[in-house]
Amino acid sequence: MGLRGKRAGVFHQPGKDKGRMGSGSLFAASGAVPSSILSLLFSLLYLLASLYVYISLIYQIGARTPDTFGADAATTRRFGLPEAILASLLILFLFLTIGASVSQPSIQFSARNLLANFLLTGCVVLVIITFLQFRGFDVSWLGGFFRLSFIRTLSTGAVLLFFAYPLILSADTITQQLFGGGSSKQNIVEFFSGSRTIQQRMMIIVFAVAIAPVVEEFLFRFFIYGVLKRYFGRLLGVTFSALLFAAAHAHLPSFAPLFVLGGCFAIAYEWSGSILVAMTMHSLFNSLTLTALAFPEIFSP
């Protein structure tokens, strides 16, 4: 869940990347307009550093020999027609779910919705894992689960997320400038902000920090991106998987920032060769978002 307060629709009808945009998200909380030349200069340097880091990653990925490292070796030579068919069915399911969410925006989000969403997405992941194992794949090897140490995974994810924020905030700012600063929040954000019991908040925290990052990164980056890259190349794979990721949250004001976030996750996975790096970034992003919602004074200008 790119926690930007997603609508109750797809994989988290909780939702929102990894409170929503408007007044209830980390972007709104941390994206205040600089009030001085010094802060403006710092923001500009931060953005330039972010662009440099991700352009460098893209350049390094492009300079590699295909099928020799990380996600290339794991998916390009392996995923075939059966996986493409399964991915197509998953994408169709996503579109149907998004359509249902958009057509019924007034559905009240609740703990029952959250639990049902968890069970549904968990079943989808289990089906895909079972299918891949039946086909003879080693999922842990494909995802690079043991490629990096725990410390290396955590530090890499934290650094790449740090440099992703200026890109996300820029997309958020541009969206607000073009379409106006909407006040709507994603359902999970409203649910979290309005929850009155520690049990409800703990349930949302567990889902957003531990469950959603694993499920979404497995589906969007490991599987869908892997299949798309196999047939259409890295660029279209990153682009289309990020579009699906943003659309799956069914919250239009958050679409552009979530698209950028999904692209950063895919680049991190492709560069590191480990889906755990993308999962770490996603989990940290959602953790910061919930922290901003719970303690807005920390992130206020």
Segments predicted by a language model, with ranges:
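N-terminal, membrane-interfacial amphipathic/helix-forming hydrophobic leader that caps
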Residues: M1-W141, R147-L148, L290-P301
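Membrane-embedded alpha-helical segments of multi-pass membrane proteins
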Residues: L45, L119-C123, V206, A256-C264
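Transmembrane alpha-helical segments in integral membrane proteins
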Residues: V53-I58, V124-F134, V209-R230
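Hydrophobic, lipid-facing residues on alpha-helical transmembrane segments of integral membrane proteins
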Residues: L86-T97, L154-S170, I174, A210, ...
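Juxtamembrane helix-loop-helix connectors linking adjacent transmembrane helices
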Residues: G99-F118, T130-A212, R230, I298-P301
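Residue-level micro-sites within transmembrane alpha helices that shape
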Residues: A116, L120, V215-E216, F220, ...
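Membrane-interface helix/loop boundary segments of multi-pass membrane proteins
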Residues: L148-L154, V215-F240, E270-S274
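Functionally important transmembrane alpha-helices
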Residues: Y231, L235-P301
